Amino acid sequence: QICLSLVKLLFYLAHSPLGSIALLDFQPRQFVMVDGNLKVTDMDDASTEELSCKEDNDCTLDFPTKSFPLQCSAVGKCKGINEKKNLFNAYRYFFTYLLPHSAPPALQPFLSDILNATGDLRYGINETLKAFEKVLHLYKSGLYLQKRPLLLKDYISLKGFRTVEGEDYKCWPSYSHLGCLLSVHSAEEAAAICNSQSQCQSFIITQQRTWTGRPLASFQSSLTDLIPDANAVVYIKRSASSGKRL
């Protein structure tokens, strides 16, 4: 969410009515989330000035670990320097830390492509936004899910109940520090996740959803007391429920 919102912001800055705008002090502290959207807290360090040049050799974009040769345009300005400066800063301050951990394994290759392409500045902001929107579409639609045997048949479902909340085993990237709370496309995907985790014996899906509209599933290692909840469904492994009273 943070990376996509940042890319949308940089897309606007690249195509603003004032011209391409560079953020000169590009640090995480300069941004804040407001209603799910990333905002710049201080525009005093923004500039529409693009480096003047006479030839391509005048247009090197330097960073501490990398340098990028750019073209000198016919009007004597380094072509796209503000856009590329913003994009590489987004790569080094945000993408490298957030993208490797922010999607299911099947989507990781798409995020790796974005990471590599922005790190080498092979993508401009237009291509970067398009790539992010493709990943978001795959994520929200569930099209990334690989065809696999139906696993939900191995679970008993109890509608209108949930288990008592409490601390349980942890997983990454969890929405809760108390246990394993992940977003899923469906109960079938949740069953696949539960099967892949040796501690998991059951999971609960409620109507709580993430910013993408995906439901949250809470994975648990033991069967605890059930309490009524009209908006929840408990799924318990048949192997875990055998011999236990439900």
Spans of model-derived segments:
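C-terminal/domain-terminus segments
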Residues: S102-Y123, W211-I227
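Short amphipathic alpha-helical segments embedded in low-complexity Lys/Glu-rich regions
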Residues: A22-F31, P105-L115, T128-E133, L145-L150, ...
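C-lobe/activation-segment region of protein kinase-like
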Residues: I21, V34-G119, E127, A131
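C-terminal, well-structured subdomains that either form a transmembrane helix-short loop-helix hairpin
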Residues: P28-Q30, D113, D120, G124, ...
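Extracellular disulfide-rich cysteine clusters
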Residues: F132-Y139, L143-L246
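Eukaryotic basic, amphipathic alpha-helical target segments in cytosolic regions
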Residues: L10-L18, N86, L98-A103, L136-L143, ...
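Catalytic-loop of the protein kinase fold
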Residues: L10-D42
